Amino acid sequence: FLLVGSIFAALSILFGAFGAHFLKEKLSSDQLVVFEIATRYMMYHSFGLLIFGLLGYILTEEIVSAPGMMMIVGVVVFSGSLYLVSLGGFKKFGMITPIGGVVLITSWLIFAYNIYKQS
């Protein structure tokens, strides 16, 4: 999770800069907002993955394994679909965005449950 979290964080910074400096002139304001949401949620969950990666060394791996894998899938589906929608021509991918959001929420809830179960 440390590796994927680090990669997601780097991509978030790269995409944020790309959006601010290159896409600002190319996308509508609505498309830019969607692109920024995708970038923001990717960054938030990169921190989550980094936390899960570090906690994997402190706690048992089973506490972070399922939530971490779900978080990776959630970021790819949620942010990935928003990137495609914002860049135009891929509006149908917007239908899967809520699935990615539900997977992200569920990853945090499973993590909370695993922590609760351990204590």
Where are the regions a protein language model picked out?
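Polytopic transmembrane helical bundles with strong interfacial aromatic enrichment
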Residues: 1-119
